[in-house]
UniProtKB/Swiss-Prot annotation:
The protein, known as: N-succinylarginine dihydrolase
Role noted for this protein: Catalyzes the hydrolysis of N(2)-succinylarginine into N(2)-succinylornithine, ammonia and CO(2).
The keyword NAD belongs to this UniProt entry's keyword annotation: no
InterPro entries cross-referenced by the UniProt entry: AstB_sf, SuccinylArg_d-Hdrlase_AstB
The organism's place on the tree of life at top rank: Bacteria
Binding site for substrate: 19-28, 110, 137-138, 213, 251, 364
Assembly information from the UniProt record: Homodimer.
Protein family: Belongs to the succinylarginine dihydrolase family.
UniProt GO BP: arginine catabolic process to glutamate; arginine catabolic process to succinate
Catalytic activity: N(2)-succinyl-L-arginine + 2 H2O + 2 H(+) = N(2)-succinyl-L-ornithine + 2 NH4(+) + CO2
Enzyme Commission number(s) of this protein: 3.5.3.23
Pathway assigned in UniProt: Amino-acid degradation; L-arginine degradation via AST pathway; L-glutamate and succinate from L-arginine: step 2/5
Active-site residues from the entry: E174, H249, C370 (nucleophile)
Organism: Burkholderia vietnamiensis (strain G4 / LMG 22486)
Length: 446
């Protein structure tokens, strides 16, 4: 059956800021308390979406979540009118106000894990929103994520949107940032690849400096609820040493697409066994795995973390050729730039490299791959997505003007205490739901 991979990028929200909330994410910690530019951040992401859509890739948009989250702040004991809640939180616990104000839902690679209909037992596309329970500012996202996905993918004959797994460390789930899929063609049955950082109920290596956010148990549970074929499901453990070096998700150290795995040599525990298992599973489905392994001598783990070489999008053009979408930081790192030049000239599976300015997102630890959720859809499934979320000239112009109207060009930590920011955000989101035709998506609209 004919199918295409669509990328749904998260629009950066109006409260985009640098609060250093993500322990284990080096860029996030390094830029803590610096001033952010939400308008620039949103436009950088929007331009990436538009350029990829112009190149013929299926490109969708996911709306931001409402921030600051008054629901969280009230749950934490702050009371009164909305402005009073914000003022009390700013005075008594500014770190909690920062968590409630984070625009981290922009990184939709963490929104959910998605299995296409070609892989599932019931022949429907399955979504499991990630519980993101390792970080407070992200653990509050999954309910709104489920609501958004249920709105966009509403046809129960074609789509299943599950609840998130129970938010406990034993089931820590970070979504598609630790998942990829290999296949001969998008519409054919494929091999789903889950990468975890630790296992809750069996002994094994674990990082010592930074936490492993994804558990084996969570990955297995997602695969089981999606009804995946066990012979086409592969699990691998991320090397704990690279987690300690700042690789907080697998998509910071490897990326896959169709029959290609682009990875650092230190990405996995027992890497050869991982490659062999993937190869055997993919062979059974009519494709041969191509592993492009980047040696540590050419690009160190530190180079990978600072440039986000592997937090790239690997996309297939209609003619089957592949393009690697990287942040401009890859061109600013001499080792990575030299490697990419050799890669493009090698006449291998990856024939082209596209470079984007995503500086505002990168300063919070999010590159091209963080900003998108991959959803493989057949023609009929795509037609069932009736909201105005597919990027084109008209939607781009509407969103670009919307950003100009509603977004600030500077937010410093102290600005989160401004009650006007809540009103500005709600006004913007209310208008956005009309642009995207998603109905009353937010609590304040209900």
């Amino acid at each position: 059956m004919n199918a295409q991979e669509a990328n749904f990028d998260g629009l950066v929200g109006p409260t985009h800021n640098y609060a250093g909330l993500s322990f284990g994410n080096v860029a996030s910690l390094n830029n803590e308390k610096s001033a952010a530019n939400p308008k620039a951040a949103a436009k950088q992401g929007l331009r990436k979406m538009k350029q990829l859509a112009d190149l013929g890739f299926a490109q969708g948009v996911l709306p931001p979540q409402e921030r600051p989250s008054l629901r969280l702040l009230r749950e934490l004991g702050f009371s009164g009118k909305d402005a009073d809640v914000i003022a009390k939180a700013a005075k008594q616990a500014p770190e909690l106000l920062a968590a409630a104000s984070s625009a981290s839902a922009m990184w939709t690679a963490n929104a959910a894990t998605v299995s296409p209909s070609a892989d599932t037992a019931d022949g429907r596309v399955h979504f499991t929103p990630a519980n993101l329970c390792s970080k407070l500012h992200r653990a509050i996202e999954h309910e709104a994520t489920r609501r958004t996905l249920s709105t966009l993918f509403a046809d129960p004959a074609r789509f299943v949107v599950h609840d998130a797994l129970t938010g406990t460390p034993a089931l820590g789930d970070e979504g598609a940032a630790n998942h990829t899929r290999f296949c001969a063609a998008y519409g054919k049955p494929g091999v789903e690849f889950f990468v975890y950082g630790r296992a809750e109920y069996r002994r094994g290596p674990e990082p010592k400096r930074f936490p492993a956010r994804q558990t084996f148990e969570a990955s297995r549970a997602v695969a089981q609820r999606h009804g995946l074929d066990e012979t086409a499901t592969v699990y691998a453990q991320q090397d704990p040493d690279v987690i300690d070096a700042g690789v907080f998700h697998n998509d910071v150290i490897s990326v896959g697409n169709r029959d290609t795995l682009f990875t650092h040599e230190r990405a996995f525990v027992n890497k050869q066994a991982v490659y062999d298992t993937l190869t055997a599973a993919l062979d059974a489905r009519g494709a041969r795995l191509n592993v492009i392994e980047v040696p540590d001598a050419a690009v160190s783990v530190n180079d990978a973390v600072t440039s986000y070489l592997f937090n790239s999008q690997l996309l297939s053009r209609a003619d089957g050729s592949q393009v690697l979408v990287v942040p401009q930081e890859c061109r600013e790192n001499a080792n990575v730039a030299a490697y990419l030049d050799r890669l493009a000239a090698a006449n291998g599976p990856i024939g082209d490299v596209l470079v984007f300015d995503l500086r505002e997102s990168m300063k919070n630890g999010g590159g091209p791959a963080c900003l998108r959720l991959r959803v493989v859809l057949t023609d009929a499934e795509r037609a069932a997505v009736t909201s105005n979320v597919w990027m084109n000239d008209t939607l781009f112009a509407s969103l670009d003007a919307w950003i100009d109207t509603h977004y600030r060009d500077r937010i410093a930590p102290e600005d989160l205490a401004d009650p006007a920011l809540l009103d500005e955000s709600r006004t913007a989101l209310d208008e956005l739901t009309q642009i995207l035709r998603v109905g009353s998506l937010y609590d304040f609209q209900r």
